[in-house]
């Protein structure tokens, strides 16, 4: 990530919320540099199971795409990025983490990502072997087993992707649009995130992380 400092962030946008029968809504926001949407449930049930969520994007032609492709949902997000045309990314190929960067033209890019993720799984993407991709989500794990040093493996999964509050907002799905420089400088993840729940954060100071990979310790 590129370190940036802002005294203020302009959060101007146009919005629209569409309500449906069954106790749910879809909220849309249009910014100068991107678009976003999210689902909202307004049901009376205290808890609900989410069977799935579909997010699909189709571009007008085969374009260059930059993505990180892990071997499964259990990932450290440390895989080397792949650079290929969309037509080379089929549904049976490795899926991708977020974000995904699409080169729409020589000077214009589209960054696909999410924001305000809470009590819900991360979204992954699969290609369609043509000019688009669709979402895929891990199922809720029900049973774990040992899997080596500091690791667990999933022994049993549910047939749904989330068990969560019945009345809530769900994660934002957004696409930032701009030149490569503008994509680096965009702040849509922050603009779409929920306000901080800790209030004044001036007391927070950087320090060591209790993990030998990050704080430089040599335990062996």
Residue ranges and their predicted role:
Residues 1-185:
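N-terminal accessory beta-strand-rich subdomains and adjacent acidic, glycine-rich linkers
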């Amino acid at each position: 990530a590129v370190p940036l400092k802002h005294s203020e962030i302009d959060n101007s946008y146009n919005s629209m919320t569409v309500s449906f029968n069954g106790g749910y809504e879809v909220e849309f926001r249009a910014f100068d540099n991107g678009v976003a949407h999210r689902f909202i449930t307004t049901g009376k049930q205290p808890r609900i199971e989410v069977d799935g969520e579909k997010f699909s994007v189709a571009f007008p032609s085969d374009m260059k795409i930059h993505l990180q492709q892990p071997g499964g949902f259990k990932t450290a997000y440390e895989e080397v990025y792949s650079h290929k045309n969309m037509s080379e990314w089929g549904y049976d190929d490795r899926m991708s983490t977020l974000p995904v960067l699409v080169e729409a033209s020589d000077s214009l890019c589209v960054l696909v990502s999410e924001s305000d993720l809470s009590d819900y799984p991360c979204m992954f993407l699969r290609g369609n072997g043509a000019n688009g991709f669709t979402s895929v989500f891990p199922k809720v794990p029900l049973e774990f087993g040992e899997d080596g040093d500091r690791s667990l493996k999933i022994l049993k999964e549910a047939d749904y992707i989330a068990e969560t509050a019945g009345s809530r907002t769900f994660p934002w799905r957004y696409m930032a649009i701009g030149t490569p420089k503008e994509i680096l400088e965009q702040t849509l993840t922050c603009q779409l995130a929920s306000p901080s729940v800790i209030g004044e954060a001036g007391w927070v100071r950087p320090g060591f992380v209790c993990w030998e990979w990050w704080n430089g310790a040599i335990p062996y």
